[in-house]
């Protein structure tokens, strides 16, 4: 009864259990400030819960458009960025998608789920994008997925390499989920390149992973096409209200981002050569320590394939980071971890 395609998938799993420190999901360690939550709750008291939300999430789209200085017709909102990814795989004509491993696994997941072949163009040894090689494989592609900063390596991709791919005029989804942590974005290129889709989220910098709010910036033609196939009412009133209020307090988000970046750089200095440079809210660490950390009550992300023997570590609160660093010193030996 169940399709063979579905049987070929494994459920997405995370480590469950009562662990004292969780640094595995790239979450923001800081919750929304209480006053921001109260503002959301106050607005929700005036909303009718018995009515469906706006069919195309226009209140949230207008708030995001005002924030960027674009038209709401350039904005689409999803129940998390994953929802938008699932549609973007189906939106365009072409024979395959292109991904650049090691990268975010959901690109290939949604492609395979929709029966779309996946073509891989590995990142260079330093994890940078090979724009020329990607452009070659982009011919007849439905869409090219590029994450910048990349997950799980953490590095920002060179603008000139991304532009090489955009010049093919094939659809390019630039996933900027972590852009706030580096302060650089290519969203303004949507005017010059109608084939560009910039994907963003409220889960990371804004600390709203539990709300499930993602959005994209693109040309009107792409946004219009997406809403032709997007499930109606998928973005609820809670999500839309939280988006509007959070954007009014973007200055608080920026303060939180600065704290996380400071901690990230402190951790990187302490880890020395074990840690790769990062432009995101996590670090890629060259250390086969997943099980040993788990024994100490610390959950990180175990990596495989090309990154076998590496872990990805979310930047947490200072005490969490200190506990992680102390554990690494015990596991790797003091000489491998500088400054501890």
Swiss-Prot record:
<keyword id="KW-0032">Aminotransferase</keyword>
<keyword id="KW-0028">Amino-acid biosynthesis</keyword>
<dbReference type="InterPro" id="IPR015424">
    <property type="entry name" value="PyrdxlP-dep_Trfase"/>
</dbReference>
<keyword id="KW-0808">Transferase</keyword>
<dbReference type="InterPro" id="IPR001917">
    <property type="entry name" value="Aminotrans_II_pyridoxalP_BS"/>
</dbReference>
<dbReference type="InterPro" id="IPR015421">
    <property type="entry name" value="PyrdxlP-dep_Trfase_major"/>
</dbReference>
<dbReference type="GO" id="GO:0000105">
    <property type="term" value="P:L-histidine biosynthetic process"/>
</dbReference>
<dbReference type="Pfam" id="PF00155">
    <property type="entry name" value="Aminotran_1_2"/>
</dbReference>
<dbReference type="InterPro" id="IPR004839">
    <property type="entry name" value="Aminotransferase_I/II_large"/>
</dbReference>
<dbReference type="InterPro" id="IPR015422">
    <property type="entry name" value="PyrdxlP-dep_Trfase_small"/>
</dbReference>
<comment type="similarity">
    <text>Belongs to the class-II pyridoxal-phosphate-dependent aminotransferase family. Histidinol-phosphate aminotransferase subfamily.</text>
</comment>
<feature type="modified residue" description="N6-(pyridoxal phosphate)lysine">
    <location>
        <position position="204"/>
    </location>
</feature>
<dbReference type="GO" id="GO:0004400">
    <property type="term" value="F:histidinol-phosphate transaminase activity"/>
</dbReference>
<keyword id="KW-0368">Histidine biosynthesis</keyword>
<dbReference type="InterPro" id="IPR005861">
    <property type="entry name" value="HisP_aminotrans"/>
</dbReference>
<comment type="pathway">
    <text>Amino-acid biosynthesis; L-histidine biosynthesis; L-histidine from 5-phospho-alpha-D-ribose 1-diphosphate: step 7/9.</text>
</comment>
<dbReference type="GO" id="GO:0030170">
    <property type="term" value="F:pyridoxal phosphate binding"/>
</dbReference>
<keyword id="KW-0663">Pyridoxal phosphate</keyword>
<protein>
    <recommendedName>
        <fullName>Histidinol-phosphate aminotransferase</fullName>
        <ecNumber>2.6.1.9</ecNumber>
    </recommendedName>
</protein>
